[in-house]
Amino acid sequence: MFNFANFYQLIAQDTVLQPWLNTLPQQLTDWQNAEHGDIERWIKALKKIPEGCADNIDLKSSVTLSNNTPLIDGERKKLENLLQTFHPWRKGPFTVHDIHIDTEWRSDWKWDRLLPHITPLKNRSVLDVGCGNGYHMWRMLGEDARLCVGIDPSHLFLIQFEAIRKLMGNDQRAHLLPLGIEQLPELNAFDTVFSMGVLYHRRSPLDHLIQLKNQLVAGGELVLETLVIDGDENAVLMPVDRYAQMRNVYFFPSARALKVWLESVGFVDVKIVDECVTTTGEQRSTEWMKHNSLPEYLDPNDSTKTIEGHPAPKRAILIAKKPD
């Protein structure tokens, strides 16, 4: 189904990542053996995606692939239909041979907010936890990261990632593994670790922060982005049921409380670098994600609240270091 051999070969040559081979192949074999109702249809479409047909690739200012000679209308429409097979597209946007994949999230806005604050990624190894379809990994490569490893257990996100990678000519600097953070050993291997949009899905947020720290080299940097509420260092919201129609959500600290949490598990130089209310321009339904989105999740009479009566989504970005 999926061939991870290139990644195995890559980490076999890396003395820091090599021990991962003790557990990773069996985990990925188990994942592939698990049934998924849509996987055959998606793989059939993936096989029809043309390989490496982009003359120009821009990962610095966007994720854009183009040819010097544009595709004819029939070829472009065929490619668009294949890519639509992988609906819904949640993270992006991507522009592929004049096809604009207008995703639910303007993930480029988040990237623009965090980029000025992080250590430059040039020649760094990066782990992106809960990476979705890998949009931000391509932007990391645009900043000259040496290696980007993303983890996310979703079948559809892996298919979308492999479709874009195939169009780029199978770039081997980025790899998406269908795993959760709890399946990773303590690698202590990555220069930068990103966790964006994950913390509020964890029953034990402090354990998640420790798991992230255990993936970093000494002196490595964590980039943490999550939903927050207003308040002091003691403020935390724990929704009784849903939040903005999301299930499986647990803890929404204030940014100041989150800073205390990070320090309590051993991070240093913790900084709150951005707080931003999520707008319906940043998250909304599109032709590439036709399900309900943020506009339907807010109180129709008061956009400062969710339909459950909680504060409307606000996200914070914090930067922290693992001690040397």
UniProtKB/Swiss-Prot annotation:
GO biological process: tRNA wobble uridine modification
Catalytic function, reaction form: carboxy-S-adenosyl-L-methionine + 5-hydroxyuridine(34) in tRNA = 5-carboxymethoxyuridine(34) in tRNA + S-adenosyl-L-homocysteine + H(+)
Statement: the UniProt record of this protein carries the keyword tRNA processing: yes
Keywords: Transferase, tRNA processing
Enzyme superclass (EC): transferase
EC numbers for this chain: 2.5.1.-
GO molecular function: transferase activity, transferring alkyl or aryl (other than methyl) groups
Pfam families per the UniProt record, alphabetical: Methyltransf_9
Positions contributing to carboxy-S-adenosyl-L-methionine binding: 91, 105, 110, 130, 152-154, 181-182, 196, 200, 315
Function statement: Catalyzes carboxymethyl transfer from carboxy-S-adenosyl-L-methionine (Cx-SAM) to 5-hydroxyuridine (ho5U) to form 5-carboxymethoxyuridine (cmo5U) at position 34 in tRNAs.
Subunit structure: Homotetramer.
UniProt cross-references to PANTHER family, sorted A to Z: TRANS-ACONITATE 2-METHYLTRANSFERASE-RELATED (PTHR43861)
UniProt record similarity statement: Belongs to the class I-like SAM-binding methyltransferase superfamily. CmoB family.
UniProt-recorded name of the protein: tRNA U34 carboxymethyltransferase
Taxonomic path: Bacteria, Pseudomonadati, Pseudomonadota, Gammaproteobacteria, Vibrionales
